[in-house]
Amino acid sequence: MRVLGIDPGYAIVGWGVVDYAGNRFAPVDFGAVCTDAGVPFERRLDEVYAGVKDVIERTQPEVLAIEKLFYQHNQTTVIGVAAARGVILLAAAQAGLPIYEYPPMQVTQAVTGYG
């Protein structure tokens, strides 16, 4: 199974693609979609959407794994990340990908073994 994992944001969207078979992961590709702080917010969301859509088209994942929204004290950041998650989820839904959401702590523990 090919999995696209995404760390959502509106400044930087980190992504990685792995193939999973027989309890083993094999890296396929990884990168980031970066947006410029000097660009209007709606344009940044468009860039996130286009970048994620391109990754989906190029790598052909079967599922999307994404971090759930983590509440922070900075409401402006939370709202921005929520909007970015929305366009990421839209790109995945339009591609017909099943979406699996995980809390940030669970992602950290799975990747590092602790957290």
Place the predicted regions along the sequence by residue.
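Phosphate- and other anionic-substrate recognition elements at nucleic-acid/protein interfaces
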Residues: M1-G115
